């Protein structure tokens, strides 16, 4: 029913509209998991994954429509500047969708006070920031723990850890979007939920502190997720290009070169985001 009420074509003329779609889909996902699975002794343990899966199901029509449209436009572009110009609206639409996910996940998680809703995301956060003390970290940063922000790793080690994790996500996004274009939304929705969990930790689960938490994580989060979106777009475009033209067609070669250009841009952005996260953001939020 949702895909009938909300037409993906509307996102073409106003990428900002995707913000409200992200808010709606993430909110519905949280509420469904909280009320349908919150009391289940087995499924409640996997609430963090189920929330993301619901978001993925809701978002697939938009992702497929955008990938299809972008591949058709990509066939005629050859320059790097031209590649950015024709794809920037799609990237902006993804970023607005991502922001909607983050705000809905963060607010919903804090208001519902269900520690299982983003349980896997909290563990992921701890695995990145405190790899040697994951269990202690999870206990500390849950609703029942005392949320005290600490930096468990030295900057150099943390930079390598974060950059390695980010490039791993980037490769996974590329492969996932190539195999099943719209499937890359899983990686993107998952990252939105992890950032939401991190914002909850940073704000000590206080609604009034959410704007500060958003600033804290969006300084590096927006360029980072933009790199993932560009990668997802590249994989989706390549997948559709193979289906439409095969691998021997001249149009496919043009599409392939543009995809390589997009991945190069994404890689540069990802390195910059890691530098900001490790060396710049801590100076503002000590």
Pin down the residues of each PLM region.
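Transmembrane alpha-helical insertion/packing segments
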Residues: 1-63, 104-111, 200
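Alpha-helical transmembrane segments and their helix-start/interface "positive-inside/aromatic belt" motifs
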Residues: 7-20, 42-50, 82-99, 256-264
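Membrane-helix interface/capping segments
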Residues: 65-84
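Hydrophobic alpha-helical segments and helix pairs
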Residues: 86-160
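Hydrophobic alpha-helical membrane-insertion segments
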Residues: 95-112, 179-186, 220-223, 266-268
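Internal active-site segments that recognize and position negatively charged phosphoryl groups
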Residues: 145-196
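Hydrophobic alpha-helical transmembrane segments and adjacent short intramembrane/lumenal linkers
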Residues: 199-267, 271-272
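Juxtamembrane boundary at the C-terminal end of a transmembrane helix
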Residues: 272-286
């Amino acid at each position: 029913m949702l895909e009938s009420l909300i037409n993906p074509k509307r996102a073409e003329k106003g990428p900002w509209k995707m913000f409200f779609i992200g808010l709606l889909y993430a909110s519905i996902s949280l509420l469904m998991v909280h009320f349908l699975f919150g009391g289940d002794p087995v499924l409640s343990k996997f609430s963090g994954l189920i929330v993301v899966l619901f978001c993925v199901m809701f978002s697939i029509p938009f992702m497929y429509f955008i990938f299809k449209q972008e591949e058709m436009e990509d066939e005629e572009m050859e320059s790097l500047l031209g590649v950015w110009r024709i794809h920037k609206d799609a990237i902006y639409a993804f970023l607005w969708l991502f922001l909607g996910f983050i705000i809905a996940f963060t607010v919903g998680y804090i208001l519902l006070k269900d520690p299982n809703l983003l349980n896997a995301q909290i563990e992921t956060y701890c695995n990145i920031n405190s790899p040697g003390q994951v269990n202690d970290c999870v206990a500390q940063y849950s609703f029942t723990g005392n949320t005290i922000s600490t930096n468990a790793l030295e900057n150099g080690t943390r930079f390598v850890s974060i950059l390695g994790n980010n490039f791993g996500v980037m490769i996974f996004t590329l492969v996932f979007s190539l195999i099943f274009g719209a499937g890359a939304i899983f990686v993107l929705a998952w990252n939105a939920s992890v950032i939401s969990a991190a914002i909850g930790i940073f704000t000590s689960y206080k609604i009034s502190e959410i704007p500060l938490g958003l600033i804290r994580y969006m300084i590096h989060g927006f360029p980072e997720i933009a790199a993932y979106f560009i990668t997802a777009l590249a994989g989706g475009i390549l997948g559709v290009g193979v289906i439409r033209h095969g691998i021997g067609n001249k149009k496919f070669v043009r599409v392939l070169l543009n995809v390589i250009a997009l991945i190069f841009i994404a890689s540069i952005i990802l390195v910059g985001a890691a530098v900001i996260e490790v060396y710049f953001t801590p100076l503002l939020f000590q």
